[in-house]
Curated annotation (Swiss-Prot):
The gene is ACYP2. This is Acylphosphatase-2. The modification S-glutathionyl cysteine is found at residue 26. Its EC number is 3.6.1.7. The modification N-acetylserine is found at residue 2. Residues 13-103 form the Acylphosphatase-like domain.
Length: 103
């Protein structure tokens, strides 16, 4: 275990999908910015169904903070109706080196 893992607790990974008015409102840009502020890694992208989906990885407390942001805050012009989280699990190492927007 690295010192980071010990200091911050277990590493977590979670997939998410955000429903509501989340496309055309800079949601991905703000998600990327918030992830960088919190220090989590992963990705975000728009779906054909009008939702935003992605994955977040990092220390459990920071992943939980990002989950809260994805559920309640979002971008200033967005309207979040609901956010679904799935595949939440403990991981031994991060799969990403940063947070990016996928197309």
């Amino acid at each position: 275990m690295s010192a980071l893992t010990k200091a911050s607790g277990a590493l977590k990974s979670v997939d998410y999908e955000v429903f509501g008015r989340v496309q055309g409102v800079c949601f991905r840009m703000y998600t990327e910015e918030e992830a960088r502020k919190l220090g989590v890694v992963g990705w975000v992208k728009n779906t054909r169904q009008g939702t935003v989906t992605g994955q977040v990885q990092g220390p459990e407390d920071k992943v939980n903070a990002m989950k809260s942001w994805l559920s309640k805050v979002g971008s200033p012009s967005s309207r979040i109706d609901r956010t679904n989280f799935s595949n939440e699990k403990e991981i031994s190492k991060l799969d990403f080196s940063g947070f990016s927007t996928r197309y």
